[in-house]
């Protein structure tokens, strides 16, 4: 059809002076000559960190700690452990994540010895309450209380400390090696007739897995190729800031086994980050360093010249971020990803699209526009693996989710990523909220990745590399969507509906 053409090339669409979000643009379908199963989503986080799936857990204190990092690695992605804590805690989280060879985040509840169990609700969905000195999984379990035994106790027997009536965990039948696989755990539970097993490494508790956990995980999609480092353990990333004290933090994180470091800043084009990039590359040449955040080619060029191995793109696009509103700076995420990726590709630097991901379609758009991976916060928050306890609000089971620019997070130290001075006023660039229970990432991420593969198939791209080539040679065409087109492309015209993604 000479004289006619569908849509625009990406170069033309993104040169019109508009700041586009993912919802503002739509790809036009291309030709299919392969099956969905033939689509490969293998990629790179940075120059030397390969991944099987393009998913990265954001370094936020309500998203990425040990269980999330282990689960993401088991899925073929990676988690970046936040640094809104002291050095020893962050290093401990990394060591713990690398030890969770069975990446099950148990529903089990943990309490301190002096605590009481007030009601059966204290057990949550678990059949046990476990007791440790810290009231957490580590370093060692002291005992446990089963829900059935507690329910049969008299009221006056319950009005004492848990320590007074808990059962001891000294019996070695409860303990198994930390690197045992799920099938062997199930066999041990069956053989020993126990309700749970304790995974132990060098005398410390690594995880607790109950029969209920095993049954739940057996229903999840089968895991593919995990992200494993040279040490044969899960690859785990770590976030740090750009202050002088972060050099000491980095030393401890490298010793703990961090496989990649992410310089965590809302505006990465600063003298502080340039100096930190050079320090990391000179001091730890074997360690990949990801710089950012950036949204322009000018910002990206400075970090590339300094030696970054990856770029994190996004400013104010996260659901809990108010940077664009408060500071009047930022960029629509679709435009930012395309522009920065165009430059980064010329230097062989992978791009991480950070923020603005609400569904599988957004992931497809981010990847096809040039990103190698997507970094997710709210998409993973509220999952079983995310830090924090579930609570009920208006009848819905939720978990807290907060921006690292919220005042609540900044009081714990995250103001460093906003180049804040602790002696001066703190201005919030984020909010605190809650997200609904999503279940385990081990279940919903595989389904999400299959949806992404279907999107790639419709575009005629069998891999990320293929998609990037089709975009840059102008084969793939795009259009901007009007408000009415966005409404039409969503669910509309129904009195009521039930939406199930899988």
Swiss-Prot record:
GO cellular component: cytosol; nucleus
Protein EC: 1.1.1.205
Catalytic activity: IMP + NAD(+) + H2O = XMP + NADH + H(+)
GO MF entries: IMP dehydrogenase activity; metal ion binding; nucleotide binding
Domain (CBS): residue spans on this chain: 166-225
Any Gene Ontology biological process: GMP biosynthetic process
Pathways per UniProt: Purine metabolism; XMP biosynthesis via de novo pathway; XMP from IMP: step 1/1
Activity regulation description: Mycophenolic acid (MPA) is a non-competitive inhibitor that prevents formation of the closed enzyme conformation by binding to the same site as the amobile flap. In contrast, mizoribine monophosphate (MZP) is a competitive inhibitor that induces the closed conformation. MPA is a potent inhibitor of mammalian IMPDHs but a poor inhibitor of the bacterial enzymes. MZP is a more potent inhibitor of bacterial IMPDH.
Keyword terms, alphabetized: Acetylation, CBS domain, Cytoplasm, GMP biosynthesis, Metal-binding, NAD, Oxidoreductase, Potassium, Purine biosynthesis
CDD domains referenced in this protein's UniProt entry, alphabetically: IMPDH
Protein family according to the UniProt entry: Belongs to the IMPDH/GMPR family.
The protein's name in its UniProt record: Inosine-5'-monophosphate dehydrogenase 2
């Amino acid at each position: 059809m000479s004289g006619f053409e569908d849509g625009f090339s990406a170069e033309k669409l993104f040169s019109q002076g508009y700041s586009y979000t993912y919802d503002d643009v739509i790809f036009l379908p291309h030709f299919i000559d392969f099956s969905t199963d033939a689509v490969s989503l293998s990629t790179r986080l940075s120059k030397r960190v390969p991944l099987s799936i393009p998913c990265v857990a954001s370094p936020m204190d309500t998203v990425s700690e040990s269980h999330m990092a282990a689960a993401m690695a088991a899925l073929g992605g990676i988690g970046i452990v936040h640094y809104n804590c002291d050095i020893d805690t962050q290093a401990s989280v990394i060591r713990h994540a690398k030890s969770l060879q069975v990446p099950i985040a148990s529903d089990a509840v943990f309490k301190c010895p002096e605590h009481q169990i007030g009601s059966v609700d204290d057990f949550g969905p678990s059949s046990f309450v476990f007791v440790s000195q810290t009231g957490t999984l580590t370093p060692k379990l002291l005992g446990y209380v089963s829900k059935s035994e507690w329910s049969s106790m008299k009221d006056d027997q319950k009005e004492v400390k848990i320590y007074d009536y808990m059962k001891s965990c000294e019996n070695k039948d409860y303990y198994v090696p930390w690197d045992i696989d799920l099938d062997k755990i199930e066999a041990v539970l069956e053989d020993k007739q126990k309700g749970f097993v304790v995974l132990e490494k060098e005398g410390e508790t690594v995880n607790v897995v109950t029969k209920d956990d095993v049954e739940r995980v057996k229903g999840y999609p089968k895991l593919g190729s995990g992200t494993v480092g040279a040490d044969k353990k899960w690859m785990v990333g770590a976030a740090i800031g750009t202050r002088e004290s972060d050099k000491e933090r980095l030393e401890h994180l490298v010793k703990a086994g961090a496989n990649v470091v992410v310089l965590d800043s809302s505006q990465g084009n600063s003298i502080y980050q340039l100096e930190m990039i050079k320090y990391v590359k000179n001091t730890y040449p074997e360690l990949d360093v990801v710089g950012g955040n950036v949204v322009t080619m000018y910002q990206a060029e400075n970090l590339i010249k300094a030696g970054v191995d990856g770029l994190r793109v996004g400013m104010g696009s996260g659901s809990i971020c108010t940077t664009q509103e408060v500071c009047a700076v930022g960029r629509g995420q679709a435009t930012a990803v395309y522009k920065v990726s165009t430059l980064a590709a010329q230097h062989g630097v992978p791009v991480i699209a950070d923020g603005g991901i609400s569904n599988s379609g957004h992931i497809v758009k981010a990847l096809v526009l040039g990103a190698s991976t997507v970094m997710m916060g709210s998409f993973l928050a509220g999952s079983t693996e995310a830090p924090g306890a579930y609570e009920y609000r208006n009848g819905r089971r939720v978990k807290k989710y907060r921006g690292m620019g919220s005042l609540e997070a900044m009081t714990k130290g995250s103001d460093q990523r906003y180049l804040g001075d602790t002696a001066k006023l703190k201005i919030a660039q984020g909010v605190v909220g809650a997200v609904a229970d999503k279940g385990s990432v081990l279940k919903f991420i595989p389904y999400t990745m299959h949806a992404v593969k279907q999107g790639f198939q419709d575009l005629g791209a069998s891999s990320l590399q293929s998609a990037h080539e089709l975009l840059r040679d102008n084969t793939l065409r795009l259009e901007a969507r009007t408000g009415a087109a966005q409404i039409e492309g969503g669910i509309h015209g129904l009195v009521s509906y039930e939406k199930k993604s899988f």
